């Protein structure tokens, strides 16, 4: 098994860490859930704008027009899918005053997992192709993806557990979203392999960077504010950026990233 594929699998498997955190002890509060969403948004924004997009633009054979064009394509592609797909948000599962029916819980969990899986799938491809092109950069991106997959797993498992009271169900739905990322890496390994040119790798990174920025600004940050109106989600965003920035500095200082 190749190192890039192993990195992709480990990054996707980090979702289970968040899932276990979401079901251990007491059910997570709205404040914790909102903070985790802001934290994930901060990591996504920093890694997209400070690592993925610059790396894509600096790739051999990549022109600024193509690089920024693919980034904008990722932005517009996300907003297009966001408008077409039905929405199901974590706070829909956090209603404590009404006991939802099992069918409605299942439907909401499916839609929520689908949305995150659509985001995770291209991340898996991007992690694999980036690590195939540059193992050091791929390691940094895999680390970033793994870090934001932890609160992402919490964001899925926490509300599902709060609504159903079933730890197994919560971990299952969170795990599915993480498996989508692994699937993206496996498909890239099977179909693309070593045939990917640096330009194609860079284009994929630029597209995914656009998707991650759009997801952070349009979904995660507003959702965090809606779940916990009494607290500013910017604190979570700043913490996420700080943790990610500090980890990247450590990697670069150690000569890894």
From Swiss-Prot:
<comment type="similarity">
    <text>Belongs to the ZIP transporter (TC 2.A.5) family. ZupT subfamily.</text>
</comment>
<keyword id="KW-0479">Metal-binding</keyword>
<keyword id="KW-0408">Iron</keyword>
<keyword id="KW-1133">Transmembrane helix</keyword>
<feature type="transmembrane region" description="Helical">
    <location>
        <begin position="5"/>
        <end position="25"/>
    </location>
</feature>
<dbReference type="InterPro" id="IPR003689">
    <property type="entry name" value="ZIP"/>
</dbReference>
<feature type="transmembrane region" description="Helical">
    <location>
        <begin position="195"/>
        <end position="215"/>
    </location>
</feature>
<feature type="binding site" description="M2 metal binding site">
    <location>
        <position position="152"/>
    </location>
    <ligand>
        <name>Fe(2+)</name>
    </ligand>
</feature>
<feature type="binding site" description="M2 metal binding site">
    <location>
        <position position="120"/>
    </location>
    <ligand>
        <name>Fe(2+)</name>
    </ligand>
</feature>
<dbReference type="GO" id="GO:0005886">
    <property type="term" value="C:plasma membrane"/>
</dbReference>
<keyword id="KW-0997">Cell inner membrane</keyword>
<feature type="binding site" description="M2 metal binding site">
    <location>
        <position position="149"/>
    </location>
    <ligand>
        <name>Fe(2+)</name>
    </ligand>
</feature>
<feature type="transmembrane region" description="Helical">
    <location>
        <begin position="137"/>
        <end position="157"/>
    </location>
</feature>
<dbReference type="InterPro" id="IPR023498">
    <property type="entry name" value="Zn_transptr_ZupT"/>
</dbReference>
<keyword id="KW-0813">Transport</keyword>
<keyword id="KW-0472">Membrane</keyword>
<keyword id="KW-0862">Zinc</keyword>
<dbReference type="GO" id="GO:0046872">
    <property type="term" value="F:metal ion binding"/>
</dbReference>
<keyword id="KW-1003">Cell membrane</keyword>
<feature type="transmembrane region" description="Helical">
    <location>
        <begin position="236"/>
        <end position="256"/>
    </location>
</feature>
<keyword id="KW-0864">Zinc transport</keyword>
<feature type="transmembrane region" description="Helical">
    <location>
        <begin position="32"/>
        <end position="52"/>
    </location>
</feature>
<feature type="binding site" description="M2 metal binding site">
    <location>
        <position position="181"/>
    </location>
    <ligand>
        <name>Fe(2+)</name>
    </ligand>
</feature>
<feature type="transmembrane region" description="Helical">
    <location>
        <begin position="61"/>
        <end position="81"/>
    </location>
</feature>
<feature type="transmembrane region" description="Helical">
    <location>
        <begin position="171"/>
        <end position="191"/>
    </location>
</feature>
<feature type="binding site" description="M1 metal binding site">
    <location>
        <position position="123"/>
    </location>
    <ligand>
        <name>Zn(2+)</name>
    </ligand>
</feature>
<keyword id="KW-0812">Transmembrane</keyword>
<feature type="binding site" description="M1 metal binding site">
    <location>
        <position position="152"/>
    </location>
    <ligand>
        <name>Zn(2+)</name>
    </ligand>
</feature>
<dbReference type="GO" id="GO:0005385">
    <property type="term" value="F:zinc ion transmembrane transporter activity"/>
</dbReference>
<dbReference type="Pfam" id="PF02535">
    <property type="entry name" value="Zip"/>
</dbReference>
<feature type="binding site" description="M2 metal binding site">
    <location>
        <position position="123"/>
    </location>
    <ligand>
        <name>Fe(2+)</name>
    </ligand>
</feature>
<comment type="function">
    <text>Mediates zinc uptake. May also transport other divalent cations.</text>
</comment>
<feature type="binding site" description="M1 metal binding site">
    <location>
        <position position="148"/>
    </location>
    <ligand>
        <name>Zn(2+)</name>
    </ligand>
</feature>
<keyword id="KW-0406">Ion transport</keyword>
<protein>
    <recommendedName>
        <fullName>Zinc transporter ZupT</fullName>
    </recommendedName>
</protein>
């Amino acid at each position: 098994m190749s190192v890039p594929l192993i990195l992709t699998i480990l990054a996707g498997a980090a979702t289970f860490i968040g899932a276990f955190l979401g079901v251990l002890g007491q059910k997570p509060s709205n404040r914790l859930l909102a903070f985790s969403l802001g934290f994930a948004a901060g990591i996504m924004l920093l890694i997209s704008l400070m690592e993925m997009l610059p790396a894509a633009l600096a790739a051999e054979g990549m022109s600024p027009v193509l690089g920024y064009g693919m980034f904008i394509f990722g932005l517009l592609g996300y907003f297009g899918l966001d408008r077409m797909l039905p929405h199901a948000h974590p706070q829909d599962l956090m209603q404590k005053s009404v006991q939802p029916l099992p069918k409605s819980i299942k439907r909401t969990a499916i839609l929520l997992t689908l949305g995150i899986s659509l985001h995770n799938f291209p991340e898996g491809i991007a992690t694999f192709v980036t690590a195939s092109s540059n193992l050091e950069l791929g390691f940094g991106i895999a680390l970033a993806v793994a870090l934001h997959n932890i609160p992402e797993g919490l964001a899925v498992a926490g509300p599902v557990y709060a609504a159903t009271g079933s730890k197994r169900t919560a971990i299952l739905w969170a795990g599915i979203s993480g498996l989508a990322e692994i699937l993206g890496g496996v498909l890239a390994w099977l179909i693309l392999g070593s045939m990917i040119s640096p330009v194609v790798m860079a284009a994929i990174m630029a597209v995914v960077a656009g998707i991650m920025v759009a997801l952070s600004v349009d979904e995660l940050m507003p959702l965090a504010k809606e779940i916990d109106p009494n607290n500013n989600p910017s604190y979570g965003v700043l913490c996420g950026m700080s943790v990610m920035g500090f980890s990247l500095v450590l990697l670069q200082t150690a000569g890894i990233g």
